[in-house]
Each structure stands twice: as C-alpha cells, then as structure tokens.
From Swiss-Prot:
ATP binds at residues 34-41. GO terms for cellular component: cytoplasm; nucleoid. This is Chromosome partition protein MukB. Residues 302-418, 488-600, 638-666, 781-806, 836-1109, 1210-1239 form a coiled coil. It comes from the Bacteria. Belongs to the SMC family. MukB subfamily. Gene3D superfamilies: 1.20.58.850, 3.40.1140.10, Immunoglobulin FC, subunit C (1.20.5.420), MukB, hinge domain (3.30.70.3500). The gene is mukB. It comes from Vibrio cholerae serotype O1 (strain ATCC 39541 / Classical Ogawa 395 / O395). The hinge domain, which separates the large intramolecular coiled coil regions, allows the homodimerization, forming a V-shaped homodimer. Its main location: cytoplasm.
Length: 1491
C-alpha cells in the first residue's frame, strides 16, 4: 500500500524570537502551547509562508482582525522578521520516501510599504543526518553562528553529495514542483488556484465556518469537467469556425464585385495619379530644360544689351559731361563775344570821347592861355589904371602941394635908385649881366619852378631825415618783410628790392586776372583733344572690327556705301531664311498631327497588346495572328471539359471517404449513430466503449470473437428491457443486448476458441459462429484510429487532387473567359502595327525638324547680329564724318603745351601770391620806410644841408628877382632925378604930366574895361570848356572803368576770334546734342528691350525656379514613390503606358471619379479610410502608393492564404473563386458531421450531474460519524436548480419546439442554449451578460447544482450550517470537517494529474484551539487519525492534548534581545503503532542474542 507523504519538520531562521529553530511535525497533531505573544502565530505564519510564498495573499492577523480589511500595513509578516536574511523551510518525506526541503528566503525591503522579498527554492536529496539548520546556518564558533545568504546555501548544498539546490523564478513553478512531489493536494496553475488554497488554509487557521468557502463550495468541491466542456467547446468552435468560414466565403462571394471594384478603382485612382505625376514630371523636366535654355540665352542677350547700355551710358555720361562743358564754354564764348563787342563799342566810345576830350583839352588849353593872357592884360590894365590913377592923383596932389610934389619926386628918385640897385644885385647874384627888368619876370617864373622842385627834394630829404631819425623800428620791420620774401638782402638794396617785389606781385595779380580766360582755353583745347582721341578711338575700333583704316573722309564715304550694300544683302538672306523656317514649321505641324493621331490610338493598342501578352503567358502559345487565337481558344474549351469530368470523379471518391471516416469517428465506431442514444435510454454502455482501450494487437481477436455483437449494448440487468424496447420509436434492425457489470465486464459469457486467424464461438448447443480475423480491425479505439489515420491520409490526397483538379478546371475556365474577352474587345487592334514605334519615329523626325528650325533661327539671329553690326558701323561712320578734321590736327598739342606753360606761370603766380601775398601787402604799406636807412643818417643830413644851402641861395636869387620885379615900375621914375635938378620947370611939367596922366588914365580905364569884358567872356568860355572837359573826362573814366570791369582786351582780332570760337563751340554743341539724342534713343530702346527682356527673364526665371524646385522636390518624392512601388511590386500595375497619352485633366478626372467611388467602398474600413484620406494630399504622391499598398495588403489579409496559392490579390480573387464552391460543399458536409443534438447535450449534462451526486454522497459517508458538541453529523446537500432542470427538460423532451434555435445558422450552440434558457425562464433577469457568455456557463454542469452544508444538531435535526446557529467549538469543528472534505475532493480530482505512486500530504491548521472542548479536540484527533491527516494547532498553556507532540513556547527577554524558549514533549496518551511481523521477528532475534 502506498503511504501518504508527511511533513517532517518546520525550520525557522532569523525570525522574531527564533534564530534557528526546527519544529518536528507530528504524524497526527502538533500543538504549540504558550501564553499570549509566545510565538505560536509566528510559527504558523512561517509554515504558511513556506507553503504559499505569495505576498499578495499572505495576511497574518489575530482573531480580532478576522474579516477586517483595515489590518496592519505589513500584513503581519514584515514585523515577524529580523533584519537580514530569514528562512522558513518545510522538511517533507513523500510517498516515494524522498526527502524534500521546500524553503523560502525572506528579507525585509526598506520603505514605507514594509514589503518583504520572498525567494522560494528546493533542496532535494539531503542525507537524513543533515539538519536543515546545518545548511541554512553557518557555525562560526561554539557560541556564534551566522545566517547564510542564498548563494552560500547553494554552495553548501553543492558540497553535499547527492544533494541538489533548485531556485524558482515564479510561484507557479514552486507549486508545480510541490504538486509533483505530493506536498500539496491540488495543482495550483494560477493565482486563482493559489487564492483558493490560501483561503482554505486561512479558514482552517482561524477556525469556524468560512463564508468565503461555503458560498463557493461548487468551485472547491465540484471538479471542472474540462473534457465535457472542451468537447462542447471544440464542437461549437468547429461549428462556429465552419459557419464563420462559410459566411466569410459567402461574404467573399458577395463582395467579389466589391473587391474587383476596389482594385479597379484604387488602380485607376493611384495609377492615374501615378502616370499624371510621371507625365507631369516628364513635361516639367522638358519645360525646365526649355526655360533654362531660354533663360541662358536671355541672360546672354541681357548681358550683351547691358554691356551695350553701359557703353552707351559711359559715352553718354562723357558726352553729357563734355556737352555741359561745351555749353559752359559756348555760353562763356557767347558772353565773351558779347563782352568783346561791348568792349569794342565801349572802346569806340572811349576813343570818340578821347578825341572830343583831346579837342576840348586843346581848346581848354588854348582858352586857358587866352584867359591867362586876358588876365595878364587885365592885371596890367588894372596896374596901369591904378598907376594912372595914382599918377593923376599924385600929379594933382603935387600940383596942389608943390613941396609934397617935391617930396614925391624925391621919393621917386630914391625908388628909382633902389630899383637900379636891385637890378645890379640881381645881376650879381644871378651872374647874369644881361638881366633887365623886363626879362626878370620869365626868369623869376623859372626860378620859382626850380624852387618848388628843390623845396620838394628838400622836404623829401627832410622827411627821410625825420623818418630815419624817428622810425628805425619801422625800417627794421619792413626790412624783415623783404627778407621774408627774398631771403638775405643788403640793407642798401632793401628799398629797391622791395619796389621790385611789389612790382612782381602786381604783375602776378595781372597774370591772375587771365586765369578764367586761360582755363577756358585749356578746357576748349582739352575737349578738342578728347574729341580727337575719341575720333581716333572710333577709327581704331572700326579698324579692329572691320579691318579698314579710316584715314580721310573719302574712306569714310566708301565704307558707308559698302555697309549700305551689305545691309541690303543681309536683309535678303534674312527673308530667305524666314521662308525656309516657315516651310519647316509647316512640316513640323504635319508631324505633330501624326503624333496626335498615334497618341490617340496608342492606348487601345497598348491595352490590346497587354491582353495579348497576358494570354500568351497564360496559354504558353505564340498567338501570332487572330486565326491562332481562335484555334487555341477551341483547344482550351476541350481541355476544360475533360478536367471537369476528372474533378467530378474525385469528388465522388472524397464523399465515400468522408462517410467512412465519419462512421469510424463516432463513439464505438458503430455504423448506426442511434446506438449511443439507445444505450443512454436503456441505462447501458456500448460494448465498444468498454473495449475502447484494447491494444491494436488484440483488436482482431475481439472483433472476430464478438462478431455482429461488437456493437452491442451492455446493461446491468436484462429484466424490464423488453418493455423499454417495445417503447422505442427509432431502432436499428439488429440490436444486441448483453447483461454484465459495466465496471467489471468480462467475456466469460462467451465460449470462444481461437483458431489460426479466426475465432470459433459456441453460441449454444445448436449454434456456432466462425469469424475470421478482419484484415482491417475496427474494434477498439487504437484500431479505429489506425484505420482513421490511413483513411484521412487517403482523403487528404484525394482532397488535394480534387483541389488541384478544381483549380486547373477553374484556371482553364478563366483562360477561356480571357480568350472570349480578348476576342470581343481587342482582336481588331491587337495585331496592328505598333503605334508607339511609329510615334517614336515621328518624334525623332519632329526633333530633327526642330533642330533644323533652331539652326535657321540661329542663322537668322546671326544675320540679325550682322545687320546690327552694319547698322552700328554706319552709326559710327556718321559719328566720325563730321569730326574727321580733328583726326589730322597736329597743332592742338602744341597749343595745349603753350597754354600749359601759361597755366604753369599762373600756378607759380598763384603760389607766389599764396605764399607772399599778405607779406607783400604789409610791405607795400611800409615800403617808404626803406628809403631812409637809419644807418645813413649823416650822409642824409649832409645831403640835406647842401640841398638847404642851394635852396637858400635860390631863394636869395628869387628874392632879388622879386625885389627887382616889385621895383620894376620904379624904373619909370628916372625923370624924377632930373626933376630934382630942374625944380622951376617942375610945375609946368607937372601940369603937362597931369594932362598926360589923365588921358593915360582914361585910356587905361577903357583898356581895363575892355580887358575885363574880354576876360569875362574868356572865363565863361573857359568854364563851359572846363565843365565839358570834366564831364567828358568823367565819362571816359567811367567807360574805362567799365572796360576794365569787362576784363577783356579789346583789339581788332578779338571779336573775330570770339566769333570764330563761339561758332566752333556752337557747331560742336549741336553735334554733341545730336549724338546725345542718338544715344538717348539708343538707351531708351535698349532699356525698353532690356526691361521687356528682364520682365520676361524674371518670369522665365521664376517659372524656371518654380519648375526646378518642383522637379527637385518632386524628384525625392518621385524616388520614394518609385522605391515604394518597386519594393512592394506594384510598379507594373501602376505604370500603365496607355495612361501616358491622356492629358492631366483627363487623368485628374479619372482619379477624382475613382476617389469618389473609393470613399464609398472604404467607408466601413477605418484603416483604408484613413489611408485614403491621407492619400488625398496632392503634395505627397507617395501616400497614394501607400494607399494602394494598403489596399493590396488589406486584400491579402482578407483572402485566406491556406486555400490560395498566390500573394497577388487580383490573382487571389480569381483563384478564390475556384475554391469557393469546393469549400462551401466541404464546410456544409463538415457541419452536418459535427452537428450535435440538444438531446445528447442534456444527456451528457445529466450523467455528469449524477456522477458528481454519487461522489458527494461518498464524501458524506466519511463525515457521517463526526460530532462536535451538539453536532452529531455533517453532510453536503446537492440539488439541481429548478430553472436549469426546466432547461434540461426543454433540451431533451421539447426538441421540436426549439428547432428554430439549434438549427439556425445565426446562433452558435452556446447562444442557442442561452436563448432557450431565456425562453423557458422568462421570469429570470439575465443582467448584462451576453448570450454567448450565458451559453458557455450553461455548458458547465456546476452551474446546474446548488451545494449547502447541513449539520445534525441535537433535537433540531438537519439544519443549514451557519455560524450564528452553532457554538464556537461546533462551528470550528464543522468548518474543519468541510475543509477536510474539500481537501479530499481535491485529491480525488487531481489523482489523474499526478503519478500513481504519489499520495499527497494532508495538513490543516487551527489557531486558538482553546475554543474547543476536550471532546471536540479528541474528535479532531480521531478525524485526523481516520483520514491520515496532520494537524497543527495553537493552544494556551492550560491545554495539553493527550496525543501528538506538544511544544511549550515561552518568550524571554534578555537585555534588548528576545528569545523564545521551546520545550517539546510527546503526548502522554500516545499509543504505539501496531508492530509489523517483521518488527516482531526482529525483536525476538534481538532477545535471543541478549540471552
């Protein structure tokens, strides 16, 4: 007998109070006794942690916390551990007598959550003498030990021979190992199973009736009938899959047109855009090249025109500058001419006035002389009149007074003597003896003049002397000024040098006055030289361009005639060139028409050619003409008919194989499927099911032995069978019934004898049956499976052949349809000449014509250039002709050099004035100081003395002459001397003198009046002459001032030169203005051309840049499009040559139409809808390809790859049509084979329920004698729910009413079950559960049962087991009983999963056992002993069980260290186990040896 596995010990390492403690586990009950806090619960926690190391489940609480969700944060484990590594180990010996140490390493994890790190491991094969602590703890010394880390434990185990260490990455693996070695009763596959096991342990630990377990007793007690449910699920899954596949096929059939529509429209949508982009890119590249060529040519033209414009601008600027200078010069020349004319007129006036003034001056001088003479006469007359009057008065007075007269005569005689003396004195002083009184007047005048000169000289000397004496400092200053200008100068030469410097400054000022004139002349000469240089440059340039030297005007005229003739010739050639270019244009237009015609017919030919190539590929024939196409089409039709016949034969063979396979696959391999139902009705089992496990070697024997009865029904009792048989409605023709024990059937009722290859069966005395061994035995599952395997292989071959035949047939049908379509649509044009080749030839000719046209255009451009050159040459000649005179002018340079010298003098004068002007101005003010050198004062003083003496002498002479002139009239008194001597005659003489004197006086008065009147006339005339002279003189001075202000030197040739210069400048200005107008016209026309060219070039450049940017950007996008298309093998479908001949609008219209259709087609597909929406972005053409790829991928995913032999959706759809009919037929047949009836489902569920009721009934027998307090028995009550009983009745008895559910393809079997449940139980609310979920629940038999726990308590009889109706001890006992029942149920359920030589350990817990009385504890002990179960309980100190092992736990505190003191003892009422015979024999032998 196999012994049950037992827990041997529990080892705790480094727990609170337990450093290294091992508790031996008793085979029955182990009691932990101790006071509060002694460590009982900690010990149980260590046991449970090693058993279930799942921290999400572990929650150790005291009984006051039972059921509380607000327990301590660490769930009671963290606080039970010490710091560092901790271990809990279970030492187990299983049924195979293997020692196993299942342990967990625990370590506190720092943090607020107070988590514990748990690592499970297993030590297997430890020798019996090695304790767990020897492995887990290292002894350091006699009194010290250290807890090993897990890797150290692994090393320590490795050193023990035969021991193995194994760690587990997960709790599932740990529990799987426990289950395999028989430590736990149930295989814990997942967290749900662990939770059930932990809840059971927890309920056992805390005692009482666990509501968590009683509420879900079905999950704990009733095993999941996985086989039944899986059978239903497999059948339902197969049916559902078949139906889904069939629906998918039907949907595919229904959506075939939609798929074709999707492919067609997506191809049109993407290919149209693809080809539009390709065409657009090709056109854009061509346009870009054209624009680039035009842009480059425009740039060259623009550069040429710009250079021309710059050259003309430069010439115009130079010309404008020259013209401005010319205008200034012309205006200056005109002004100068006007000035010269005015100056000449002024000069003429001045000359006329000068002549008048000279005449007036002459007359004035004459008149002055006349006036002076008249004055002299008047003075003399006045003097004579005065003398006469005085003489008369004197004579009268003399006559009146003789003495007075005598005195007067004496006075006169004295005056006469004095006059003679004065004359003598004058003669002596003057040293002129010839001097007379009459000549003294002239001499006196001469001497007075000399006196004035000498006086001036004397005054100058006096001034110099005064200056020399008073202004020595001024002399030094002036002398410094002279030296500043001239450097070192002798003092004696200072005045002279100063005068020379002043003259030089005045000459420089005079030179500066000619600056404007000389500069104007210089500008004139410069312009003439510039014109000369320009003319020479033009001539040189012309010579360079035309290789003709322009030496004279005749050569210019000859060149002009030559260029005129050349212009006429070039214009004629240009006209011929235009005519030839027009002819080529006409030919190009004709070729363009041909190209358009070829382009119009090319798409249809391309489609026809593609269809022809496709036909050639499909058929493998040449198909050279239309006759070969028709002939091959007839051959394809005949092949298709032959292939269809072969396919039908294979279909018949497949149907036969399917029926045989279906029969062998049925239970028992019966030919009649009704036998299973009859066996259930009669309460028996098919004989084939009893012998289902026989080997394949025994199958022929048993098949022959039972013969026709091999499909018999075995019943336990034949009595009453006949009545049941009579009631049968549907029954096979032959039905065999055998009486026997279903569970222990044997073949003893048959008298059989095995012969060679046969069996002879003696039925009775008069009947015997001989049956040979079948060649193919079908009795027993092994034989049937072998046959089924052969049949299925054959069927697979037949199916494959049929599929191949169907595919070939469909392929031939499609090929024939393709021939039909080709003949109908493309036969007329498929064999025409290739329009693309003709199109290429036409395009080549057109390109040649375009090149010729370009050559003519280039030639025409060259002619235009030559024309332009000739026109420019004529223009240059026109410029040169008026100025050819300057070409040979040689005097300009000399004149210019002469003027340069003058301007050099002018510059020197400017420099001299700039350097010394101010100094000379100061010097000019003080130059007179230099006349008298203070160092020459003595010489100057001597000179002054000499001049003064000479002047005094001259004055003495003049005084003598003046005295003589004053006494001149005294010479008339010569007679007075005589009168003094003749005094008697005095009176008479006085009278005579008086008469004479009176007459003289009268005459003198008359002369005086006449002289005065004449003097008055002369003075009047003199005054008028003086006024006229003064006016004329002032006018002349004004004219001279004006003439001086004119600043010109008017001479006879000045006006001629001015006129000549003005006319010359006027002619040059006219020429310059004509050239300026020509240049301006050239600039205007050039600017207009350049503006138009720039505008055109900007537009071309913008278009070029836009096109180039578009081409460059599109290139990357196009490369990505091509890469995508080639990588996904869709380029051949997108690159449709026929679309290349459509316009962009036509392609866009085609794409837009397909886009509208695609929006409707993909409206229900989110991925394709999003891809289509993204593909509408025209800036991202690759997205359309991605959409096309997505469509293909979608179609690839939609098409079943298991039945299609291609990845191309287009071909796959065609191939799928081949398989549709075959698959539809197969799936329909399979569904008929897999269909299950509702009656069989009810029968299976009822049988399973009955089996479980019997099992629970057996479990109740084990609990019938249990008693706790007033409880005398515990049992489980199981019953079928009323609503589910109604469902079973509906399934089995009312099939006809519910055919609409189970025979409908709309519902799966589960959904039909749910619908039926709702139909028969309309009062039950189904909630939110779907029919599928509810149907799956209804396929689980456990949902049909209700389980409850009842107790037989005192006089109340059997009552529902509830904690409130029982005492604490009764509840604990009842709960433990239920848990034992669950553990036993789990062992029964898991028996088939574990090895047959393993019986698992049984152990339960009970904390605080003080709530049980002694009788109850004894009952528990008895229960443990009867059910071979171990029990670990905790009890207070006052309880000491009589049996098992008891540990006394006392917690002691030594300083800051806690330690639990443990004392173990055996129960005093421990009964020894009965000794075996071997043990008794060994004891007897030992006794004999002792004696």
């Amino acid at each position: 007998m196999i012994e049950r596995g037992k827990y041997q010990s529990l080892t705790m390492i480094n727990w609170n109070g337990f450093f290294a403690r091992t508790f031996d586990i008793d085979n029955l009950v182990t009691t932990l006794s101790g006071g509060n806090g002694a460590g009982k619960s900690t010990t149980m926690a260590a046991f449970i942690t090693a058993l279930i190391p799942d921290q999400s489940l572990l929650h150790f609480r005291n009984t006051t916390e039972a059921g509380s969700s607000q327990a301590s944060r660490d769930k009671g484990l963290y606080g039970k551990l010490q710091a560092g590594a901790c271990y809990a180990a279970l030492d187990v010996v299983n049924s195979r007598n293997q020692r196993l140490l299942f342990a967990v390493k625990l370590q506190q994890v720092a943090g607020r959550d107070k988590k514990v790190d748990i690592k499970p491991f297993l030590i297997q094969g430890l020798p019996s003498h090695v304790k767990p602590t020897d492995v887990l703890v290292e002894t350091v010394s006699d009194k010290h030990a250290r807890v090993r880390q897990i890797n150290e434990v692994k090393d320590a185990v490795g050193q023990i021979e035969g021991a193995h260490f194994k760690s587990f990455p997960s709790i599932v693996d740990y529990h799987a190992q426990m289950f395999e070695f028989g430590v736990i009763p149930k295989k814990l596959r997942n967290s749900s199973d662990r939770s059930k096991f932990y809840r059971l342990i927890e309920a056992s630990l805390y005692g009482g009736i666990s509501s968590a377990i009683t509420r879900s007793l079905r999950d704990y007690l009733l095993p999941q009938n996985g086989g039944v449910k899986k059978a239903f699920q497999d059948m339902e899954s197969a049916l559902r899959e078949n139906r889904m596949t069939l629906e998918a096929i039907k949907t595919t059939q229904a959506d075939r047109d939609l798929f074709k529509h999707l492919i067609t429209e997506s191809t049109n949508y993407v290919a149209a855009d693809y080809m539009r982009h390709a065409n657009d890119r090709r056109n854009k590249v061509g346009q870009t090249l054209v624009l680039r060529g035009e842009l480059f040519s425009s740039r060259e033209t623009l550069i040429e025109q710009n250079s021309l414009l710059n050259r003309v601008h430069e010439e115009l600027e130079l010309l404008v500058e020259q013209e401005s200078a010319l205008e200034q010069d012309y205006q200056g020349a005109s002004d100068h001419l006007q000035l010269v004319q005015n100056a000449l007129r002024q000069q003429e006036k001045i000359e006329r006035y000068q002549e008048d003034l000279e005449e007036l001056n002459f007359r004035l001088e004459e008149q002055m002389m006349v006036v002076e003479e008249a004055n002299e006469r008047v003075m003399m007359a006045e003097e004579r009149a005065t003398i006469s009057e005085e003489e008369v008065d004197s004579l009268k007075s003399q006559l009146a007074d003789y003495q007075q007269a005598l005195d007067v005569q004496q006075t006169r005689a004295l005056q006469y003597q004095q006059a003679v003396q004065a004359l003598d004195k004058a003669r002596r002083l003057l040293d002129k003896p010839e001097l007379t009184a009459e000549s003294a007047q002239a001499l006196a005048t001469q001497l007075k003049a000399e006196q004035e000169t000498r006086t001036s000289e004397l005054l100058a000397l006096k001034h110099k002397l005064d200056m020399s004496s008073a202004a020595a400092q001024q002399f030094n200053h002036a002398f410094d000024l002279v030296k500043r200008v001239l450097g070192e100068v002798a003092r004696s030469e200072a005045s002279k040098q100063a005068q020379q410097v002043i003259r030089q400054a005045r000459e420089a000022q005079n030179v500066l006055q000619n600056e404007a004139q000389w500069q104007a002349q210089q500008r004139d000469l410069e312009r003439q030289l510039e014109q000369q240089r320009s003319v020479r440059e033009l001539a040189t340039q012309y010579h360079k361009q035309h290789m003709v030297a322009l030496d004279d005007a005749a050569t210019v005229e000859l060149e002009r005639e030559r260029h005129s003739a050349l212009l006429e010739e070039l214009e004629t050639e240009q006209e011929n060139c235009r005519e030839q270019r027009g002819q080529l244009r006409h030919q190009e237009q004709e070729l363009q028409t041909q190209i358009a015609r070829f382009e119009s017919i090319a798409p249809a030919w391309i489609k026809a050619n593609d269809a022809l190539e496709t036909l050639r590929e499909q058929s493998g024939a040449e198909l050279a003409d239309s006759q070969s196409v028709m002939a091959h089409m007839q051959q394809v039709l005949e092949l298709e008919k032959a292939q269809s016949m072969a396919k039908d034969k294979l279909a018949e063979r497949r149907a036969k194989l399917d029926s045989e396979i279906e029969r062998l696959a049925s239970p028992g391999g019966s030919n009649d499927p009704r036998l299973k139902g009859l066996a259930d009705t009669l309460g028996g089992v098919l004989l084939s099911e009893i012998y289902d496990d026989i080997t394949i070697d025994d199958a022929p024997y048993f098949s022959a032995m039972y013969g026709p009865a091999r499909h018999a029904i075995v019943v336990s009792d034949l009595s009453g069978i006949k009545e049941k048989l009579v009631e049968l409605d549907d029954c096979p023709e032959d039905l065999y019934l055998i009486e026997g024990d279903v569970d222990a059937f044997d073949d003893s009722s048959f008298n059989a004898e095995e012969l060679e290859g046969a069996v002879c069966v003696q039925l009775n005395q008069r009947q015997m049956r001989y049956s040979r061994f079948p060649a193919i035995p079908l009795f027993g599952r092994a034989a049937r499976e072998q046959r089924l395997e052969l049949l299925r292989e054959e069927r697979d071959d037949v199916v494959e052949q049929h599929a191949k035949a169907s595919f070939d047939s469909q392929k031939l049908q499609r090929l024939y349809a393709s021939f039909n379509q080709f003949v109908a649509m493309h036969l007329q044009v498929a064999f025409d000449a290739d329009p693309e080749q003709a199109l290429a030839n036409a395009r080549d000719k057109r390109n040649q014509l375009l090149r010729s046209i370009s050559e003519f255009e280039a030639q025409e451009q060259q002619l235009r250039s030559q024309l332009q050159a000739s026109k420019q040459a004529l223009a240059a000649l026109d410029k040169l002709a008026p100025q050819m005179g300057l070409l040979d002018e040689e005097t300009l340079e000399a004149r210019y050099q002469e003027l340069e010298e003058k301007l050099q003098q002018l510059s020197e004068a400017k420099a001299f004035i700039a350097a010394h002007g101010r100094t000379i101005s100061e010097l000019e003010k003080v130059a007179a100081v230099l006349d008298a050198d203070p160092e020459q004062f003595d010489a100057l003083e001597q000179q002054y003395q000499q001049a003064d003496q000479a002047l005094q002498q001259l004055k003495a002479q003049i005084f003598a002459l003046s005295d003589l002139l004053e006494r001149r009239h005294h010479f008339a008194y010569s007679d007075s001397v005589d009168l003094l001597n003749q005094s008697s005659e005095l009176s008479e003489q006085l009278k005579a003198k008086l008469v004479q004197a009176e007459s003289e006086r009268t005459r003198s008065r008359e002369e005086l009046k006449q002289a005065q009147a004449q003097l008055s006339q002369y003075n009047q005339l003199l005054a008028s002459l003086k006024s006229s002279h003064q006016a004329k003189l002032e006018t002349v001075q004004e004219f001279k001032q004006e003439l001086q202000e004119f600043g010109v030197h008017a001479d006879e040739g000045a006006i001629e030169r001015a006129q000549r210069r003005r006319d010359e400048l006027q002619e040059r200005l006219h020429t310059s203005r004509s050239r300026k107008s020509e240049y301006e016209r050239t600039i205007t026309s050039t600017e207009l051309e350049m503006k138009a060219l720039v505008k055109r070039m900007k537009k071309v450049e913008k278009d070029y840049q836009d096109l180039r940017t578009f081409v460059v950007n599109a290139k990357a996008g196009w490369c990505s499009v091509l890469r995508l298309a080639r990588q996904n093998d869709v380029e051949r479908r997108l690159h449709k040559r026929e679309l290349a001949y459509l316009s962009a609008d036509e392609l866009r219209s085609m794409s837009d139409k397909s886009l509208g259709a695609l929006r409707l087609a993909v409206a229900n597909n989110e991925d394709l809808r999003d891809a289509l929406r993204q593909s509408e972005d025209n800036s991202r053409p690759e997205r359309k390809v991605l959409f096309y790829i997505a469509v293909y991928q979608h179609l690839r995913e939609r098409i079943r790859q298991d039945i299609i032999r291609t990845d191309d959706p287009v071909e796959a759809i065609e191939e799928m049509e081949v398989e549709l009919a075959r698959l539809t037929e197969e799936l329909t047949q399979r569904e008929q084979r897999l269909a299950i009836s509702s009656d069989s489902v009810a029968s299976i569920i009822r049988k399973t329920i009955q089996r479980e009721q019997n099992r629970i009934r057996m479990l109740n027998q084990g609990l019938s004698n249990i008693s706790f307090g007033q409880v005398n028995g515990v049992r489980l009550n199981v019953k079928v729910r009323e609503s589910h009983e109604i469902l079973l009745a509906g399934l089995s008895e009312q099939q006809a009413q519910h055919k609409d559910l189970f025979e409908s393809a709309r519902y799966t079997f589960s959904e039909a079950m749910a619908k039926l449940f709702q139909r028969v139980n309309p009062h039950i609310d189904m909630g939110q559960r779907s029919p599928q979920v509810l149907g799956e629940e209804l396929l689980d038999y456990r949902n049909y049962l209700e389980l409850s726990v009842e107790v037989n308590r005192g006089s109340d009889g059997w009552l529902q087991a509830e904690s409130g109706a029982l005492s604490t001890g009764e509840a604990i006992g009842t709960g433990q009983s239920i848990l034992l029942m669950v553990v036993q149920s789990w062992e029964e359920e898991s028996r088939r999963l574990r090895s047959k030589d393993i019986v698992p350990c049984r152990l339960l817990f009970l904390d605080e056992a003080a709530r049980l009385d002694a009788k109850s504890i004894a009952t528990l002990f008895e229960l443990c002993e009867r059910l071979d179960m171990q029990l670990l309980i905790a009890a207070p100190e006052n309880i000491s069980p009589e049996k098992g092992t008891t540990y006394k736990l006392v917690r002691k505190v030594f300083k800051d260290h806690e330690h639990v003191h443990v004392v173990g003892l055996r129960g005093f009422a421990q009964t020894e186990k009965p000794k075996t015979a071997e043990q008794k024999f060994a004891e007897e032998l030992a006794g004999e040896l002792t004696e």
